[in-house]
Design a protein with these regions (language model features):
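Short beta-strand segments that buttress and anchor functional surface loops
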Residues: 29-35, 56-62, 127-136, 144, ...
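N-terminal leader/targeting segments and the immediate start of mature chains
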Residues: 1-54, 89-90, 116-121, 182-201
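An acidic-aromatic
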Residues: 43-109, 157-172
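Non-transmembrane domains of secretory- and envelope-associated proteins
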Residues: 10-19, 97, 104-126, 136-142, ...
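A residue-level detector for well-ordered beta-strand positions
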Residues: 46, 144-145
Length: 201
């Protein structure tokens, strides 16, 4: 029995008293953000600065998409402001942030859901799945998948009104911020307009 229990622990079948790991507080990488309502995928390079509550998102061009604009977003939560910069013209919009800072991590009061491997034999990564599910509320509004080693985000999914609304996949992550100036808005934002720009022409 002890041998069987040890095997299950190693393979991720059973995890006793799992505790949320501490995710990196600063990193850069790439994401795919999927809006389930519209069916739209947005690929982007991301710089994440947890201590200063800053996020920079640079949309990636993947092929020619007719009449599609690509933007850079600089979100400064401590200042409650977001800058939207059109990548070609550098036109800038300054928009108030109304949502609170939501870090990429596993909250301390999260519920452990599962542990498993992603990938196949010889090329696999162990991850843990956590949620905000509580005993009095059977359904969760957030599910996060993080690597066991180094606690990097793999996927986060949000649900509302019993349906999945958004999901984000993370990849190519490396710790630290190579150039902190990416969080500084360009000079065109000194005369920014106060309305969000349309993504289509």
């Amino acid at each position: 029995l002890l041998i069987l229990l040890s095997v299950l622990l190693l393979r991720g079948g059973v995890v006793a008293a799992a505790e949320p790991c501490q995710a990196p507080r600063q990193w850069e990488g790439r994401t795919v953000f999927y809006e389930h309502g519209s069916g739209r995928n947005t690929r982007a390079a991301v710089s994440y600065d947890g201590p200063n509550q800053r996020l920079r998102i640079l949309e990636e061009r993947k092929g020619l998409i007719p009449c599609k604009k690509f933007f850079e977003y600089i979100l400064l939560y401590k200042d409650a402001v977001m800058f939207q910069i059109e990548q070609v013209t550098k036109l800038c919009s300054k928009i108030a942030l109304t949502e609170p800072w939501d870090p990429y991590d596993i909250p301390a009061n999260s519920t452990y859901e599962d542990q498993y491997y992603i990938g196949g034999p010889g090329d696999e990564i162990m991850v843990q799945e956590w949620s905000d599910r509580k005993p009095a509320r059977k359904l969760e509004s957030w599910v996060g998948v993080y690597t066991v080693k180094d606690c990097y985000p793999v996927q986060e999914t949000y649900t509302k009104n019993y349906s999945v609304t958004t999901s984000t996949r993370f990849f190519d992550i490396h710790p630290g911020i190579a150039d902190p100036s990416v969080f500084t808005p360009p000079s065109t934002c000194q005369t920014a307009q106060l309305r969000r720009m349309r993504e289509e022409c």
